[in-house]
Amino acid sequence: MSHPQQRFFVAGVKQFLPSYFSGRSVIEIGSLNLNGSVREFFQDCNYLGLDVGEGPDVDLVCHGENYGGAANSTDVVISCEAMEHNPQWKKTWLNTLRLVKEDGLVVMTCATPGRRQHGTVEFNPSDSPLTIGKSQNYYRNLAACDFTDLLQHDAWFSVWGFFEDRSSHDLYFFGVGKEASEEARTQALQLHAALKDHYHKVNVLGHY
């Protein structure tokens, strides 16, 4: 489910890494358009939106952990505000890393500790209608350590980072692959520094 802080993060990634948002192959995991879609950030791309049921901006009904595309075949894999609703988020994350090219980009946003439960039978089921429709009544706020305990991200990415926005209780990730160009690595390092500074201002100085 789209919201301003999450869209700000994706826009920031695009600002610093624009080449990944035009003329590329893209897979979005959890692509249902509820109140806005990250699809609009991409231009002239071969775009495939996956979700667990039919709906706006869903191109293929498929669980993210089950999508069997070729390994190292996709320029960008993106998932926004979906992992917290996915009981198989670990397998989905591993499949994300399997799918992305060695010089590709991964972008992920999800809820982190402090966010109120949503998209369940008990709390705001309309926030995740496809999982509710599949009787998948699951929710978990995720922290960076949940992902870093799963695997060593340095094995996949030359530049990467998790960032937390405590104003919205969001967790954000971006990473560019080990074979990314020198230009992309430089841009990614600049992005990492800018995000670190921004979320220090938000989380520590209260600038939001």
Q: Model segments located where?
A:
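Class I SAM-dependent methyltransferase Rossmann-like catalytic core
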Residues: 1-20
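Conserved SAM-binding loop
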Residues: 15, 21-116
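S-adenosyl-L-methionine-dependent methyltransferase catalytic module, highlighting the catalytic core
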Residues: 87-101, 105-208
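Intrinsic disorder/low-structure terminal segments
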Residues: 8, 20, 40-41, 146, ...
